[in-house]
Amino acid sequence: MKKIEYKAKAAVENLLFKCAGGMAGQSLMLVHEDRDDGFYDADLHEVIAENAKELGFFVQFYPIAFDPDVRMMPYDLVCASASADHTIFVARLGDQIRFCADIPDATWIIVYAIDVDMLVSNFGRADYAGFDAVKTEINRFLIAADHIHVTCPAGSNFSGHAKDLEAETNDVTIKRFPISIFTPLPTMYFEGRIAQNGFLIGTGSKYYKPYSCGLQKTLFIEFSGHHITGFHGDDADITAAKNHYQFVADTYGIDPFFIHSWHAGIHPACAFNAPAPASFERWSGAAFGNPRLLHFHTCGEYPPGEISLNIVDPTVSVDGVKIWEAGVLHPERLPAGTKLLAEFPSLKQAFDHPAKNIGLGEAGRLSII
């Protein structure tokens, strides 16, 4: 068996057995976009299907047209999925409705590996159960913390806590594969400054145009609780940012300066090898799982909002313990981290050999060009 074929099979085993909890003999519906839509690798759903069949699953395809402004779950899709044991989204629709409460009582999974290279890398092959355990451990540690302090080389500096907010945290109702973030923390008890380089960009909820807003210099966004309270930096950038926020808010009838929640990446094998401007939509939908990125949901009083802010190489200190340090996640600094690394060898391999590429420009920062 060729090496790439072996890796693809291992990744699909991880998806179907570890993530979906499936077994041979069950049925699988693959929801996919048209081949020429360009977001997902055109062959990705076929690679998954081929390996799923070899693993003993019955596979059916459900092609779906991309809707940039989807409002609800398509009824025909809900009906079709009822006949399958597992529904796998190789389509942006899964990301767009990931916080929807009306998900059927079935296994629905959104694939965040957007091409075959991502799928067969350690991103797709590292044990799903191991990253699920890391996510749970991080969630527990963050929710219990008295003080969380975040900085970055560009000048971000904010702090606060999420105690007593466990019931307020909003996680997706569709499973992610791979698991690449912890449950987003509400900003209710946080305040400070976010340093944004390069651009403002959409969250994958709705695909408006223009999807990004270029910044020439570092823009500082001040916030307190759930509200953006000010912009500081180059005058042209401030004007552009305010106008972009207002444009998106007016388009959807939402609060422009509401800031909902934040999270950082937890999967060190998540890589984005092209510069972000090569496809802002693909970058926004795929790169965020790398620990070098910390991501805010803003513009709209709901997760994930419509505009994301992205911090590069964060240091996240939790009650004095630097769980993320200069963009490197240290699971061994979590209470149960060393045990998890020993229990899941592929987890340790991923953390020992982290992917560095996250779509930065030539200057080593996010860039509009």
Indicate where each model-derived feature is located:
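Cysteine/selenocysteine-centered motifs that mediate thiol-based redox chemistry or coordinate metal-sulfur cofactors
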Residues: 253-307, 311-313, 356-369
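A short, hydrophobic/aromatic-rich structural module that often spans a beta strand
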Residues: 75-91, 240-254, 277-290
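Short conserved micro-motifs at the rims of enzyme active sites and ligand-binding pockets
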Residues: 206-207, 233-234, 273-276, 306-309, ...
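Mixed-charge (polyampholyte) low-complexity IDRs
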Residues: 287, 292-304, 309-348
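Long, well-ordered mid-to-C-terminal structural blocks that present hydrophobic/aromatic surfaces
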Residues: 208-250
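Active-site bordering "gate/hinge" segments
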Residues: 1-218, 224, 255, 321-327, ...
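Histidine- and/or cysteine-centered catalytic micro-motif in compact active-site loops
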Residues: 197-199, 224-228, 233-236, 265-269, ...
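Structured core elements
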Residues: 193-195, 220-222, 230, 263, ...
